[in-house]
């Protein structure tokens, strides 16, 4: 059996560009792509923390070290500059890979869209 699992996540990225008339996609700083294990043309889901919008598009490379998160084409209508977003990708993972210790790549970034940390799991949510 295969399970549809979270593969990659870039958490709380700030939108730096919205390019309505650019061919659709999301340009992501190449450093962030690599850290999250994402590649060009990979399907991504984007969740806008500011307004609750959720949509899918595909990743393209943004300038390395720039902090770029550019929503292009119709996706540009889903956010404003400075909105915080979560960018995620999922993968089909078989039971053997899961049992062998397969883990997602979670990337946490700062206010300038620079990497501030990595994790391979989402912590247990507690009621406190």
Swiss-Prot record:
Protein localization: Cytoplasm
- Residues that bind substrate, according to the entry? 57, 73-75
Give GO MF terms, alphabetically. Answer: aspartate 1-decarboxylase activity
Instruction: Provide the Gene Ontology terms for cellular component.
Output: cytosol
Reactions this protein catalyses: L-aspartate + H(+) = beta-alanine + CO2
Known EC number: 4.1.1.11
Give the note describing cofactor binding and stoichiometry: Binds 1 pyruvoyl group covalently per subunit.
- What is an annotated GO biological process for this record, any one? alanine biosynthetic process
Q: In which pathway does it act?
A: Cofactor biosynthesis; (R)-pantothenate biosynthesis; beta-alanine from L-aspartate: step 1/1
Post-translation: what modifications? Is synthesized initially as an inactive proenzyme, which is activated by self-cleavage at a specific serine bond to produce a beta-subunit with a hydroxyl group at its C-terminus and an alpha-subunit with a pyruvoyl group at its N-terminus.
Matches recorded under InterPro entries: Asp_de-COase-like_dom_sf (IPR009010), Asp_decarbox (IPR003190)
Q: Name the Pfam families on file.
A: Asp_decarbox
Q: Where is the active site?
A: 25 (schiff-base intermediate with substrate), 58 (proton donor)
Instruction: Give the similarity note.
Output: Belongs to the PanD family.
Q: Which HAMAP family match?
A: PanD
In UniProt terms, what function does this protein have? Catalyzes the pyruvoyl-dependent decarboxylation of aspartate to produce beta-alanine.
Stated name of the protein = Aspartate 1-decarboxylase
Originating organism: Burkholderia cenocepacia (strain ATCC BAA-245 / DSM 16553 / LMG 16656 / NCTC 13227 / J2315 / CF5610)
Q: Which gene encodes it?
A: panD
